[in-house]
Amino acid sequence: MKETDQMQSLEGSGAERSVGTQTGSMTGQIPRLSKVNLFTLLSLWMELFPGVEAQGQKSQKTEEESRGPLGDNEELTRVSTEKKQVKKTGLVVVKNMKIIGLHCSSEDLHTGQIALIKHGSRLKNCDLYFSRKPCSACLKMIVNAGVNRISYWPSDPEISLLTEASSSEDAKLDAKAAERLKSNSRAHVCVLLQPLVCYMVQFVEETSYKCDFIQKTAKALPGADTDFYSECKQERIKEYEMLFLVSNEERHKQILMTIGLESLCEDPYFSNLRQNMKDLILLLATVASSVPNLKHFGFYCSSPEQINEIHNQSLPQEVARHCMVQARLLAYRTEDHKTGVGAVIWAEAKSRSCDGTGAMYFIGCGYNAFPVGSEYADFPHMDDKHKDREIRKFRYIIHAEQNALTFRCQDIKPEERSMIFVTKCPCDECVPLIKGAGIKQIYAGDVDVGKKKADISYMKFGELEGVRKFTWQLNPSEAYSLDPNEPERRENGVLRRRSAKDEQRSSKRPRLETRSAGRATLQ
C-alpha cells in the first residue's frame, strides 16, 4: 500500500502548502477547486491545445513529398506507428504553488523535453503536473533537473499501452524504466487526485450554464435556447472520457500495474480513483462547454471599420477559446462569494518555438482573491447590497487581472503581441493597468460594458484606445447570413442556419466550419 499511502500523504502536504498563498485555506459559502485539482485539470486541458494536429499533417505531407511518389513505405509505416504510440501530453509547471509554465507536446518533442528546453535549471524545486505519466526519456532529464514533485493522470501513459502497435513490448520496457527512475529518484513521482468538495460539480454546472458566453449566445441565435449547452456538454463528456479514461476496468488495472500503481488496483482505492477521475472529466467538459465552439460566434472586434485590419492580427478562434477556458477554470479558485473571475496572459513570439503551443507562450495567470497570506475573516466579504460601505469587499479584493500581472513569470515585451483573456469585462480599476503593462489585446465578455454599479464601474473598457478588444459576439462579417427564412440544422448541439449550397456539399466533405476571412475549424 506504499503508493496509496504516498498519494494520501502528498495530498495532505499539498493542502498545507497552499495555506497562505492567496488565502489557500479559505472556506466559505461556495465550493472551491483545490490547487492540486486545478493544476491537474489545466494539464488535461493543455493536452487539447489546438493547432498541433494541423501542424503534424503539414509536416507529414512535406515528408511524403520529399520522398517522391513511391517513397520509403516501410520507413513511413515505422514513423507513423511510433507517432501513434506516443500520446500528446499536457504539462503545468508550478513553483511555490504559482503556475510558471503551460506546455504541450509538439510534433518533434515530448512535453517533458520542452519543459527542459524552456525552463532549464529553473525547474529545480518545481512541481510538474502531467496529463499522462511521462516516458523514461523525459523522466530522467526532469529528475536530473532537481524537480520537487511529478504528478500525473493515472490512465494511459505518454508511451501508450493501449495502442495495438508492433512495439507494444517497448512500451512495457519504457514503463519499467520509468518506474525504476521513480524508485531511485529524490523527486516524488506520484498521483495527486483529490475528491471534489461537496456540490462542486453542481456548482460548476449552474455557473457554466449562467455564464455570459452561454447566455449571450442563446439570446443572439434565432430559435435557439440554452438546451444547446446541455447537448454540447454531453458531446464533450463523451469525447473527453474516450481520451482520458479507460472504459474497461480490467484493462485499467493492467495499465496501473504496469506503471507501478499496483496498490491502487484494490478496492476501495480503485473504485474511488475511477470516481474521482470521472468527476474531474465531467467538470472539465462542463467548463469547456461554457465557451462553445460555434460557427457564427467567437471573439471579434466590434468596430466594423477595423474588422479587416484586425483579422490578420487576431488569434484563430480555436486558440482564443482554449485560452478563455483556461481562465474559466482559474475562476473556480475565486475567493469572491458572488462572482468568480479568471485571467490568463499569453504572448506570441516572432517565430514558432519547439512547444506544441507554437509561437505562443505563457506569461501569467490569476483569479480574484484577497491579499496573499490573509485568512478568511481578515477582510469583509459583503457586496454592494450591504448598506454599510465600510464592510464591503471591493476595497480589499485583488482582481484576477491584477493577480495575473503581479505573479507573471515573464516580462511583457513591447515588440511582441501579448494578450489577456478575462472571463468578465475588465473594470475601470484594471483597464489602465492592462494598457500600462503593454498588453496589446484583450479577449473578454462584454455584458457589463458601459455599466456603473455601486462599488465598481465598467466605463473605461468601451473608451479604451491603443489596445485591441475582442469580445464574445456574432461574427460581424457573417451576421447577415442568419436569415430567419433559412432552414435550420444542429451543429455541435446548436441551432444553425443552413443554406441550400451547404446541403448539397455536406455529404461530400467533413463538417468544416469557416470562420471569418478564411479561418476554419474542423468540428
Curated annotation (Swiss-Prot):
It is found in: Cytoplasm; Nucleus. Residues 1-27, 55-81, 478-523 are annotated as: Disordered. The keyword Hydrolase applies. It is an enzyme of class 3 (hydrolase). Zn(2+) 1 binds at H110, C135, C138. A motif (Nuclear export signal) lies at residues 272-284. One of its GO terms (molecular function) is zinc ion binding. It catalyses: 2'-deoxycytidine + H2O + H(+) = 2'-deoxyuridine + NH4(+); cytidine + H2O + H(+) = uridine + NH4(+). InterPro entries: APOBEC/CMP_deaminase_Zn-bd, CMP_dCMP_dom, Cytidine_deaminase-like, dCMP_deaminase-rel, Deoxycytidylate_deaminase_dom. A motif (Bipartite nuclear localization signal) lies at residues 489-511. The active site is at E401 (proton donor). Belongs to the cytidine and deoxycytidylate deaminase family. This is Cytidine and dCMP deaminase domain-containing protein 1.
